[in-house]
Amino acid sequence: MTIVSQVILKADDELRYPSGGELKNITDFFKTGEQRLRIAQVLSDSEKKIVDQASRKLWQRRPDFIAPGGNAYGQRQRAQCLRDYGWYLRLITYGVLAGDKEPIESIGLLGAREMYNSLGVPLPGMAEAIRTLKEASLALLSSADATVAAPYFDFLIQGMETI
C-alpha cells in the first residue's frame, strides 16, 4: 500500500484531515516518483539480462546447486529457478514503485515461506540467489538509483534468511 493510501486510510479511520507530517511524507513520495519509475523501467527492461547474469554468478558460487542432487539440477529445476528469479525481480520492482516494502512482504515472503518449506528448498540458498540478483541489478543502475533500490533487495534477502 502506498504512503498516499496509508495516510488516507489512517486519517479516515480517525475522522480527521491528514496532518502536516503526513502531507510532507506524501510530498516526499511524489518527489521521488520519477526516480522510482526510472529504476522500475531499468529493472523490467533488463529482466532477462539480470536473471542470466545473476544465475551464472550463483552457479559459479554454488556449483552444488546444479550438481546431481542439487535443487537446480536438471533442465526443469533450473528453469524453475530462473522463473523464480524473474518473479523476485518483479516483486522488487513493485516495492520500488510503491516506495514501500509491504508488497514484497505480503506478495512474496509470506507465500515463499509456505512454498519453499513444502518443497524442501533450502532458504539460505534462496538468500544467496537474491544476493546475486541484487548485484546484477544494481550494476545497471546509477549510484543514486542503486542506493534507492538496494534496501528492497536487502529486505527480501533478510526475509529469506529468517524464514
From Swiss-Prot:
Amino acids binding (2R,3E)-phycocyanobilin: 81
One GO term of the biological process aspect: photosynthesis
N4-methylasparagine modification, residue list: 71
Signal peptide range: none
Tree of life domain: Bacteria
InterPro entries tied to this protein: Globin-like_sf, Phycobilisome_asu/bsu, Phycobilisome_asu/bsu_sf
Key word Electron transport present: yes
Subcellular location: Cellular thylakoid membrane
Membrane topology field: Peripheral membrane protein
Post-translational modifications: Contains one covalently linked bilin chromophore.
Purpose of the protein: Light-harvesting photosynthetic bile pigment-protein from the phycobiliprotein complex. Allophycocyanin has a maximum absorption at approximately 650 nanometers.
Subunit structure: Heterodimer of an alpha and a beta chain.
Family: Belongs to the phycobiliprotein family.
UniProt-recorded name of the protein: Allophycocyanin alpha-B chain
